[in-house]
Amino acid sequence: MWEPKNLLSPCLLLLLGERPDHGYELVRRLRPLGIVDGDTSTVYRTLRSLERHGCLCSDWAPSGTGPARRVYRITAKGRAELLSWLATLEETRRRLDYYMRRLAPLIENRHGA
């Protein structure tokens, strides 16, 4: 079954576009999107990659209950990248809709046979 692992970057940009956050909380916010199953190291690698490419910036912020946490923020370049992803996702949705319209008669014929 297909897993949306290639959607991790745009999902992180989306969440950070909504508000700055630290890694652990981003992992928690990704779960309802079906992006993270158990291996969180991919999330942290992707955050570092997005930061290296200038899509995010980060700094250390004190935590009320423990050590300081790295808080990530989206940059102007990250917002532009997010808009680019929007166009890609809209095109993907258009293609999937076309596929589903063609698939529907095949499924109906199979159940009717």
Tell what function each PLM region has.
Residues 58:
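Short beta-strand "wing" residues that participate in macromolecule-binding interfaces
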Residues 80-113:
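Amphipathic alpha-helical dimerization/coiled-coil segments
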Residues 54:
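Glycine-centered, phosphate/nucleic-acid-interacting loop/turn motifs that mediate DNA/RNA or nucleotide
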Residues 35, 61-63:
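Short polar/acidic secondary-structure junctions
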Residues 64, 68-86:
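Basic, amphipathic "hinge/linker" alpha-helix immediately C-terminal to the N-terminal HTH DNA-binding motif
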Residues 48, 63-64:
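Short secondary-structure boundary/capping segments
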Residues 44-51:
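Short, hydrophobic-biased segments on the C-terminal half of alpha helices
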Residues 2-44:
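N-terminal helix-turn-helix DNA-binding core of bacterial DNA-binding proteins
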